């Protein structure tokens, strides 16, 4: 396969798309996975108005656009819009000709087979790529941490998964999905800040709350204890300056917001928290490999970026696991992008080059070829 041509790595998340070149240590382009279409067909002549906007451009024009997220809970649900996102990725963000580069795409765990075939078809038929490959997101995160066995808790904007992986292969029967992620935490923070008398309603204000979440929230080691401390002193209080210059004070909301990951009932969800989901996932695996999984719990995705998460995970898993079990939770500092980084590593390995699905193979066998050549 083309040794001299750099492969492209595209990680399509529910909230953000991360894209760049294999061999790089970080993605070149990170933009929101959103499509915006004008609410009215333009009356303004000669404005050069497009029928659709993608990514950051949508954010700046959001008042006049109808917004759509083509990836819901990690799964592509609107292929026309997805095609626009890929087009934008290649031509506007990376500024490359896709027909000249092999492309590594990522997919959610348990992505339906038909979806994977559709991705393959679009890459070869619409973008004429010379070769492509589809890898499971959590597996890439594990590679990025230098492991081939472990359990990944991957939590992004739209969905969380626990994915046990043994010697490089995900174990599908033990993968669990939790429809609780960054977007829900932002919603919950909006709600509890309202109780303090701060009102955030519009989509633009929602972005402000997301920023507050990312900058000020943390996970308590002991929630009840932290609530007591917060009630008795102002040590947890922090101030945040809004874009208009006003300053707001955030107190116990700082740790109440991400506590939802461990106690989904806070937002009325009847689901196990991330710690329990991880435990259940390990329990679905063969007893002989559980020790290897408990010793390699790898966090991945933007929603695992909260301070204190590794300590809390360790504590909760220790309480649930068999008494003698050694538990190690790994939280790599670059975990926000570890899926992309894993893809960058994989696509540049010499041993991986025979794994690409080439245009010729696709033309011979059709979209089904993707199942034979991906893990």
Swiss-Prot record:
Superkingdom of origin organism: Eukaryota
Keyword flag Mitochondrion: no
Keyword ATP-binding: yes
Location in or out of the cell: Cytoplasm, Cytoskeleton
Coiled-coil stretches noted in the UniProt entry, renumbered to this chain: none
Residues annotated with N-acetylaspartate modification: 3
Entry keywords, A to Z: Acetylation, ATP-binding, Cytoplasm, Cytoskeleton, Hydrolase, Nucleotide-binding
Gene Ontology CC: one annotated term: cytoplasm
Pfam families in the cross-refs: Actin (PF00022)
Main location: cytoplasm
Enzyme Commission (EC) number: 3.6.4.-
Function of the protein: Actins are highly conserved proteins that are involved in various types of cell motility and are ubiquitously expressed in all eukaryotic cells.
Family per record: Belongs to the actin family.
Name of this chain's protein: Actin-1
Species of origin: Naegleria fowleri
């Amino acid at each position: 396969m083309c040794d001299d041509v750099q492969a492209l790595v595209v990680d399509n998340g529910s909230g953000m798309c991360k894209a760049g070149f294999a061999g790089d240590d970080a993605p070149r382009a990170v933009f929101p996975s959103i499509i915006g279409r004008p609410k009215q067909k333009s009356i303004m002549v000669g404005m050069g108005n497009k029928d659709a906007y993608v990514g950051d451009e949508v954010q700046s024009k959001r008042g006049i656009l109808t917004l759509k997220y083509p990836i819901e809970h990690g799964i592509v649900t609107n292929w026309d819009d997805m095609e626009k996102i890929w087009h934008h990725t290649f031509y506007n963000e990376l500024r490359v000709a896709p027909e000249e580069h092999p492309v590594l795409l990522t997919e959610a765990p348990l992505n339906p087979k038909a979806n994977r075939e559709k991705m393959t078809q679009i890459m070869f038929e619409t973008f004429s790529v010379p070769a492509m490959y589809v890898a499971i997101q959590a597996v890439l995160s594990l590679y990025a941490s230098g492991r081939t066995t472990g359990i990944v808790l991957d939590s992004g904007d739209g969905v969380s998964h626990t994915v046990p992986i043994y010697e490089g292969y995900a174990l599908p029967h033990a993968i669990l999905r939790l429809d609780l992620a960054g977007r829900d935490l932002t919603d919950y923070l909006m709600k509890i800040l309202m109780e303090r008398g701060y009102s955030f309603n519009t989509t633009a204000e929602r972005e402000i709350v997301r920023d507050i979440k990312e900058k000020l929230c943390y996970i308590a080691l002991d929630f009840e204890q932290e609530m007591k401390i917060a009630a008795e002193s102002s040590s947890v209080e922090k101030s945040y300056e809004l874009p208009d210059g006003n300053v707001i004070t955030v107190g116990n909301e700082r740790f109440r917001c991400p506590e939802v990951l461990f106690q989904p009932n806070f937002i009325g969800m009847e689901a196990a928290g991330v710690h329990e989901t991880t435990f259940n996932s390990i329990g679905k695996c063969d007893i002989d490999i559980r020790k290897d999984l408990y010793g390699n719990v790898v966090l991945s995705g933007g929603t695992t970026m909260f301070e204190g998460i590794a300590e809390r995970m360790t504590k909760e898993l220790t309480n649930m696991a068999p008494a003698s079990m050694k538990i190690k939770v790994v939280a790599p500092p670059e975990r926000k992008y570890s899926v992309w980084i894993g893809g960058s590593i994989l696509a540049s390995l010499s041993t991986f080059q025979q794994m690409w699905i080439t245009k010729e193979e696709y033309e011979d066998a059709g979209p089904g070829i993707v199942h034979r050549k991906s893990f």
